[in-house]
Amino acid sequence: THIQIDLGFGDIVESIDYPMDLTSTSKGPLFESTIHVRSYPKEFIFAEKLETVIYRGMGNTRMKDFHDLYSLIALESCLNPSYTDQVVAMVFTHRQTSTENLPLKFDSDFIDILQPLWRDYRRDLSSSQTSIPLPESIQEVISSINSWLTQNTNLCSPQEKKPE
């Protein structure tokens, strides 16, 4: 079993408390019948990844950030849109990053720089590292993220919103 722990300091998190039933024996529970595990909400992961992409801007070559953002929006009902809206605003405020840079805006020259990085990133992924087929084009990933943001949140400026 592979366990990965990511430690973060200084960020705000509203954890979720999940009850978990423990394994029991024929004589009953080994210890307690249920424990409570605090979990990091997916909306906070999304908000922190999005803030990192915005903050790093054209200095961001971390394809994992784009992969994670795409995966979270691609999974049906993974994110609660209204909660995501609140959490993104909270994380951006806490990290002193403006939401005015949403949706993601990259010029074609930067997309041309990202594309080979994205291609190599996708090639190096094992099948266990992705549960969703990833687009071949980084532009498609960015467009999907932007589309989700404009359709599901109030984070984009009114001129960026798509008509309903």
Question: Model-derived features: where do they sit?
Answer:
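Structured mid-to-C-terminal alpha-helical surface segments
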Residues: T1-E164
